[in-house]
Amino acid sequence: MLAGRDAVTADPPSAATAPASWGRSTRRRYSIMLATAAIVIALDHLTKWLVTSHIPLGNQVPATNQIVNIHYIQNSGAAFGLFPQFTYFYVVVAVVVAGYILAFGPRMGGGLLRLVAFGCVLGGAISDGADRVLFGHVTDFIDFHFWPVFNVADIAIVGGMLVIVVQLGFGGGRPDRPPAERP
């Protein structure tokens, strides 16, 4: 109970009345998410730079096994190269996704894994979105022969979304509430 009010119907505290530790917790959650996004962006751009610097466009380099090749292509479409005429629509989608994650991601509840997942999606969206703005395409290079060619940002986006969807599917998606409002 909160000062004679039912905890279920009580309004959440404003920023002025929230405990100081709640603000630090939110900052910590944002820090984890943004650090993860920065790592994804750095890895994605490093790997793209290595590929574009050492492999001619369209060429393939077999890896040490028969499962994966490095195949340098430029993708102006969506996933799997679909709809290349909508390049700037994908930029808008990346901005909307990034904005949503920045606004609501750390407040969606869940633990460290979910924060890292949101950071992966954010980093992948920013990285591929930046490539579309700067170059008009995304560099893809990971080729498993049985699947369309993709990149590190794609792995981060798909992996992050998979974690988020699985966690939300198991009821872990309630927004964070201050300790006084928790059942």
Model segments located where?
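Alpha-helical transmembrane bundles and membrane-interface segments of multipass inner-membrane proteins
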Residues: M1-P183
